[in-house]
Amino acid sequence: MKLILTAAIDNLGVPGDIVEVKAGYGRNYLLPRGYAVPATRGAEKQVQDLKRAQEARAIRDADRAREVKEQLANLEGVSVAVRTANNGKLFGSVKPNDVAQAVVAAGGPELDKHSIDMTKGFVKSTGKYSVDVKLHEDIHGTINFEVVSQ
């Protein structure tokens, strides 16, 4: 049975892939759950058109990501002001959302807080820090910022 996937299925494919599966798997699992549609000539042409549009959109997104990466590289004076104790320890921590707001306040581009990578842990003391930003699948930038006492 030939089907066009509408959702990512492990060990089978991604949305838009044309796959050949056993009739029972297609009829009893993929089609009822909406994970696939029957492959017809019209549907195959529609999938090809969608893939072309997605490729064009991916190229535009990559170009925009390169522009944002350049803006971040030229950005200076990013500082996050937080309340601290006398010894420089923060009351709380600096999170990705705080960094994104500081970038915008410094005249930089607006960033999604989920794209800022703080996997090493949140910042808990004053000083200079650097975090990575995922702008596109294979385009990453860096934000240098300083945590200062309020």
UniProtKB/Swiss-Prot annotation:
An individual GO BP term: translation
Gene3D superfamilies: Ribosomal protein L9, C-terminal domain, Ribosomal protein L9, N-terminal domain
InterPro entries named among the record's database cross-references: Ribosomal_bL9, Ribosomal_bL9/RNase_H1_N, Ribosomal_bL9_bac/chp, Ribosomal_bL9_C, Ribosomal_bL9_C_sf, Ribosomal_bL9_N, Ribosomal_bL9_N_sf
Top-level lineage group: Bacteria
GO cellular component: ribonucleoprotein complex; ribosome
A Pfam family: Ribosomal_L9_N
GO terms for MF: rRNA binding; structural constituent of ribosome
Keywords in alphabetical order: Ribonucleoprotein, Ribosomal protein, RNA-binding, rRNA-binding
Family membership: Belongs to the bacterial ribosomal protein bL9 family.
Function, as annotated: Binds to the 23S rRNA.
Protein name: Large ribosomal subunit protein bL9
